[in-house]
C-alpha cells in the first residue's frame, strides 16, 4: 500500500526519529479531526470520518420537531374524520331513514378509499414534493365537507364520504414521508411522538368533539367543524411548512422552486449563507407512478410486514368501530359519554411514545453496539451489513401475544357487562402495545425502502385499511350471531397465529424465501453470514479502519513516509479512546495485506523521461586519423544543429507507451505524416524542440488515453524527475482526476533511479547511431526530420524490448522493490564531469532532401494517424479544386483557337470555298 510514497533527499534510518515524526504527525491529524471518536458525536455540518456518512439534514433539533408537528397535524384530518363520525352514526341513520348497517357501509367505503388514495398521492409526492400534495389534499377535503354538510340522501353521503377519504388519507402517507426525509434510522423513534402527534390525538379527541356537536348542534355541524379545522391546518402548511423531499431540496441546503416555497420563504428577503450540498440530492423520479406502492407490495418482505401490521390494525378497528354502538346499547350512554370513553385509547397511544417507541430506539442501539456499528447523531446509519430486522422486531412478538390476550379480555368483558373501569383500562393497554408494534413495523418498512418513503407508507396504509374495512364489515354481523366475546377471541387468535406462526417449519420458510435449509438454520441460531462477520482477531471496526486509511493518505500527501510504526500508533490511539488493548506486532503488515485495493500493483507502475537528439549530429564518416585514437570518431554537421526531444513512458510489466516526439517549428508539416511510422505515435512542435509546460500536459493526456484501458488496479504510479514541466498545476489536476499517483525522484539522482536512463535510452541512442551510419553509407549525410523519423522508428523497435524494460526497472531497484539498492545508490557524491575539448574536422554536406513540405497545422500535437487523415483530406480538396480549374481553362482555350482559325481562313481568301465543309 505504500507504493505511492515519495522518497526524500535526506533519509533517516533511525527508528527513534521515525517513531517521533510519525507520532507528531498522528497527533496533528487527530487534533485536526476531532470527530474521529468512535462514540456518539455531536452534529455538525460536514461528513464524519468515523462513520463515513454526511450530515443528514441542516435543520436543528427544534426545527425538526416543528416541521414534524405541522405535518402531523395536517395528517390528523384523516383519523379525525373517522373518529368524529362514530357518535353521529345513529343520528344520521335516523334522519336519512336508513339502518345503522347501511351507515356502517359508509365507514367501510371510507376505509377502502383511505387505503387506495395514498398510493396516488405518494407517487406524485415522490416526484413533485410533499408540500404541493398537502395543499391538493386539503382542497379535495374542503369540497367533500361542504357537500357532506348539505346532502340529504344515503347515496350522496356514500359518494362524498369516499371523496372525503380521498382528500384526507393522503396526508397520512405524506407525514410518514416527511419523517423519513429529515430523521435518521437510529433517531426515528425519538421523533415519532412529534410526527404522529396529530394522528394520535385525532382518534380520541374526535369522538368527544363529535358527541358534543351532535348533541347540541346536530350531525351536520360535524362536517362544518371539519371544514374549519382543515382550513386552519391548510394555512399552517401554506405559511410555515417548507419542502422536505430529498430529490428536491436534499438535506435542506438546496432551495426549492419558487412556486414550491412557503409563505415565510417567499417573504424572506435574506439570503442564506449555506452552500448547497448537491451530493445530498437523491435520484428524482421522471414521472409519478401510482403503481409503485403495489410494486413494493410484490416484494415478499414488504408484503409480509404490511399484512402483519394490517391484521393488527384490523383487530384494533374491530374494537373501536363497535365501541360506540356497544356502549349505547349495553350501557345506555349518550353521544358525549361515548366520546369520553375514547379518551383512554388516546392517552394510551401518547404514552406509547414514552415507553414502547423508546424501547424501539433502545433495541436499535443495543443491536448496533453488538454488531460493531457506530451510531452518530444526525447521520444516517449504514445498514448494508446490519441485521435490521432483529433491531426493529426484537421485542414485537412478545407484545403481539400480550395484545392478543388483552383483545380477548376486552371482548368477554363487554359480553358479560363488566364494569366500565376494567374495560377502559384494557383499551388503554391495547393502545399502548399496539401503537408500539405498529410503529416498529412501519419503521422497518421505511428503513428498507428509504427512496420510496411515501410509496411504502401508502402501501402499508392500503393493506391495513383494506383489512380494517373488511374487519369492520364483518364484525357487526358476527357480533349478532356469535356475540362480542367470541368475535374478539376469533379476531385475536387469527392475528396472533398469522403474525407468529404463519410459517410452521424452517423447511417451508426455506422454500418460500429460496434459501438453503443450512443457511436458514444458521441464521435462526444467531450465526451471521461470513461476509457480515468480523474475525476474532479484528480489533478495529470498519469505520476505524477507514480513519487509518485516511491518515495514511494524509501522511503521503504531506510528504511523510507512512511506516508500520505510524499505522500501529494511529490504531493504538483509536483503541485507547474506547478502552481497547493495543494491536499486535504483525497487525500493520496484515492490515496492509488486507487492504490490497489501496495498493499499486507492479502492472500499474510507469516511468517516463525525456531524451534529446541533435539531428545534425551523425556518425562515422571516412577520415584519416591517428592509429592510436580510440573509439569511433564523430562528425558534426555545422549547418544543422536542430534539436528533437523524445518523451517516452514505459511500464514495469515490460511494454512501452507510444513515443511522443517534439520537433522545432511552428506548424505540423504534411511530409512528416507520409513516413511509415505507427498511427499512434504523437508529434508536437515547440519553438526550439524542447519540452514546455503545455507539452508536458499534452503528453500526460497522451499517457492517460493510452493507459486507461490497460490499468489492472484502481491506481497508477508515475515515476519521473522534478522538472518544472512535470508538476505544473494542470498536470497535478489531471493526475488527481485520473487517480494517478506521482513519485518525484530526488535531485541529481535520475541517472541512478530512472529506469529509462539505466537501460533504455543508451541502447536507443546506439541503435539510432547505427541507423545514421547506414544512411552515410548510402551517401546521405544531411539529416532532416524526414530522415530522422524512419531511423528513429527502427532504433526504437530494436531497443525498447520487453527484456530491456523489465531489466531497467530491476536495475533501478524499483520493481521488484529493493529499498537497500535504492538507498545505497543515493549515498554517493555527485561529480560533474567536464570532457576535454577535441577539434572536429569541418566538412560540407550534400544537398538535403528537397521533398515538398506543406503546413497542415500550427502548434498542438498530432498523432501519425491524425496527420495522415488531415493530409489526405487536404489533398482531396486540392484535387477537386484543380479539376474544376482545369476544366474552366480548357473550355476557354478551345473558344480562342476556333476564333483564330476562322480569322485565318477569311484572310487567305478561301473562306468561301471551305465554308460548307467547315460547317
From Swiss-Prot:
Gene3D superfamilies: MFS general substrate transporter like domains, Ribonuclease H-like superfamily/Ribonuclease H. The keyword Amino-acid biosynthesis does not apply. One of its GO terms (cellular component) is plasma membrane. Glycans are attached at residues 104, 260, 461, 915. Keywords: Glycoprotein, Membrane, Transmembrane, Transmembrane helix, Transport. Residues 865-886 have a biased composition (Basic and acidic residues). Residues 1-11 have a biased composition (Polar residues). Residues 887-896 have a biased composition (Low complexity). The chain crosses the membrane at residues 69-89, 132-152, 192-212, 222-242, 303-323, 333-353, 393-413, 418-438, 465-485. Belongs to the major facilitator superfamily. CAR1 family. This is MFS-type transporter clz9. It comes from Cochliobolus lunatus.
